[in-house]
Amino acid sequence: MEPVDSIDYLLDAEAPGRLELVRRFANTLDEEHGREVLHSPAQLRTLLLELGLIGRGVRVTGDDLARAHELRDTLRHLALANNGIATDVALEATLTVRVDDRDAVLEPSERDVAGAFADLVGIVYTAMADGSWTRLKACRRDVCHWLFYDRSRNRSAVWCQMSVCGNRTKTRAYRARRG
């Protein structure tokens, strides 16, 4: 994998609210071009700071990096399920429910890297509960799997970008039919 500092395209496919944190975290790997943002604990720390999931004093280890890669893969598989591709994965995290007179909020029990990962799982849970999760999809193109937010009225988008992945998939199918 080629290490890169960020993958800053497809900003038009942003997810609403905190679900965007999940999309940005999951899109730290560009499968098609072999670009990896999370290539070191320092890069993971930078991302988690940018996303506001950890404080400045939090230390990030190689084990945290390995868990980040696993979490990212699981999030992508769950998002593939939103695009009609069967998957058999699950997320697990320790979260606390904070309730006041106006709201109930899931929060991580810890303020470390594990807490940051739990926060992402909590965002997924909340999105599943409010119905927005089904719109966060992973691109169907087998070498992409980029997460995008489906804003189509009938929730029918299957590719992160029709002009790229949709076109390439349709062209390949056309050529296969033509022999």
Descriptions of predicted regions:
Residues 150-157:
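Short linker/helix segments within small regulatory modules
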Residues 1-138, 142-149:
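Short helix-coil boundary/hinge micro-motifs
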Residues 136-141, 157, 162, 168:
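Residues immediately within or flanking Cys/His clusters that coordinate Zn2+
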Residues 163-179:
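Basic DNA-binding region of bZIP-type proteins
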